[in-house]
UniProtKB/Swiss-Prot annotation:
Record-given protein name: 3-deoxy-manno-octulosonate cytidylyltransferase
Family recorded in the similarity comment: Belongs to the KdsB family.
Domain of life from the UniProt record: Bacteria
Associated pathway: Nucleotide-sugar biosynthesis; CMP-3-deoxy-D-manno-octulosonate biosynthesis; CMP-3-deoxy-D-manno-octulosonate from 3-deoxy-D-manno-octulosonate and CTP: step 1/1; Bacterial outer membrane biogenesis; lipopolysaccharide biosynthesis
EC top class, as a word: transferase
Entry EC number(s): 2.7.7.38
Higher taxonomy: Bacteria, Pseudomonadati, Pseudomonadota, Betaproteobacteria, Burkholderiales
Reaction(s) this enzyme catalyzes, per UniProt: 3-deoxy-alpha-D-manno-oct-2-ulosonate + CTP = CMP-3-deoxy-beta-D-manno-octulosonate + diphosphate
Annotated SUPFAM superfamilies: Nucleotide-diphospho-sugar transferases
Function: Activates KDO (a required 8-carbon sugar) for incorporation into bacterial lipopolysaccharide in Gram-negative bacteria.
GO BP: any one term: lipopolysaccharide biosynthetic process
Subcellular location field: Cytoplasm
Gene: kdsB
Single GO MF descriptor: 3-deoxy-manno-octulosonate cytidylyltransferase activity
Database matches in PANTHER family: 3-DEOXY-MANNO-OCTULOSONATE CYTIDYLYLTRANSFERASE, 3-DEOXY-MANNO-OCTULOSONATE CYTIDYLYLTRANSFERASE, MITOCHONDRIAL
Amino acid sequence: MSIPAFTVVIPARLASTRLPNKPLADIGGHPMIVRVAERAHASSAQRTVVATDAPAVAEACAAHGIDAVLTRADHPSGTDRLAEVAAQLALPDDAIVVNVQGDEPLIDPQLIDDVAMHLAHHADCAIATAAHALHDVAEVFNPNVVKVVCDAGGRALYFSRAPIPWSRDDWAGVPAVPASAAQVPLPAMPVLRHIGLYAYRAGFLRRFPTMAAAPLEQTEALEQLRAMWHGERIAVLETAAAPAPGVDTAADLERVRALWAQGMAQEGP
């Protein structure tokens, strides 16, 4: 199967608690949101659109020839924002929309293509996403690292901040919250870390805002659990390696700037 037609939507908000004005942070002479859009343009997407509630972000995009749409500021989640964009663009129900986070300036364009293709290959699923095996046990027990377990067909069974699956034999005697993960072995069965890249069918995006919030979604603070609670299937693409780091904090921004500078230096004469 050839790569399906798809649209990339990049949500971008200025109101970040840990890094204010994050979409406009400079990376190599351009705002971060522009760098993310450049990576999306390098994929096979037919169109890339930035979705923002901030005129300053829309203006920065326009200055660099990037499509942007203004959305409401009161959306409870990024998926709700995507639903508004899908409606504004009048996308048909079977159209594929890939949600690329606005703080991923180093995202691999091939991964964007792969997730879109994965959804196209799973006609029974409304959503596709990605995951990779963890090799650091500290990340297994880190609640900020979301884990996913899948069925035999690679469809998500559950997402959690807890270490899942719990390896009874490998972790015999290990408390659920160990004082230190340094002495805890990696289990025989791989633990998969969820990668926050999603492909959706536009019809699902139209349904999502009408779905009642789910207790599991609220408990784990993971909006994909709302979809699963209401019976939607999620296809999970397992990748061989972790993606490039995103930007959540000022320290992350400096690290990405350094990586970007190294890449630009390697490309130079």
